[in-house]
Amino acid sequence: MDWLIGITGLPYDVLVLMLLCVAGAFAGFVDSIVGGGGLISVPAMLLTNLPPSVALGSNKLSSIFGAGSASVTFLRNGMVDFSLVRKLLPFTFIGSMVGTVAVVSLPPFYVKPIIIALLVGVTLFVVFKRNWGEVNRTSQVMGRALHICMAFALGIGIYDGFIGPGTGTFLIMGFIFTGFDFLHASANAKILNFTSNLASLIVFFYLGHVQVYYGLAAAVGQVIGAYIGSQLAIMKGSSLVRVVFLSVTTVMLIKLVFDYITNL
């Protein structure tokens, strides 16, 4: 980052805050449409030389603003099935807290192959089944289907607290399998993602693992990016969300495979 300081003449702290804001805007834009914004925002936080746990905690602070901005936009436009989402919120909240504080028996190294396999399967399914997620076919979710959704919400909450990036993408997958189109699945997912971020942030604050200034700098960008992204998703509909979804899952796959291979 020294070369940027030389070019701009800006103090280090000011430059870091500006870069986090820009990274937050890109992350918020992508995350508001299909999730996966953490693939941008977490590395940006790590570049500031924060300890990993503090980088994750600071990222949660910024992410909650981005998720909140997108959630408000989707709610105002009637895109959220709140009758279903409100039943899932407690499970996501509890799961995220558990994932953040628990000593998990399986370290991330062993969990990543499972995630890679899931992403490969769903990505190929979306590519070859072109009409999947294009039409909103959902009806009232109840009985066994509701119980499955609750278990899924709990599991994704744990995943968000334990690993993080890609949570929104997996939530969208779950809602599409329930019968929602890409757009409504993205809207529902954003509400749960906001909830899991809030739960995880509470724990990180309690542990003192949040750099507030860095988190708020990225949050400014997150709010702007999330607003633009959610508005664009509503304007363009499921076809846009599908394209961005495939792009993000492909990038996630490449990164996860690379990280897994380099850690062998």
Predicted regions and their residues:
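Selected transmembrane alpha-helices and immediately adjacent juxtamembrane segments
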Residues: 2-51, 136-186, 216
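Residues within membrane-spanning alpha-helices of integral membrane proteins
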Residues: 17, 60, 115-119, 123, ...
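Residue-level signature of the transmembrane alpha-helical core
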Residues: 21, 25, 29, 60, ...
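Membrane-interface alpha-helices at helix entry/exit sites of multi-pass transporters
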Residues: 50-59, 83-87, 179-190
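Selective hydrophobic functional segments
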Residues: 57-113, 117, 197-247
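Transmembrane helix exit motif
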Residues: 68-79, 116-141, 251-264
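Hydrophobic alpha-helical transmembrane segments in multi-pass integral membrane proteins
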Residues: 155-165, 200, 205, 253-264
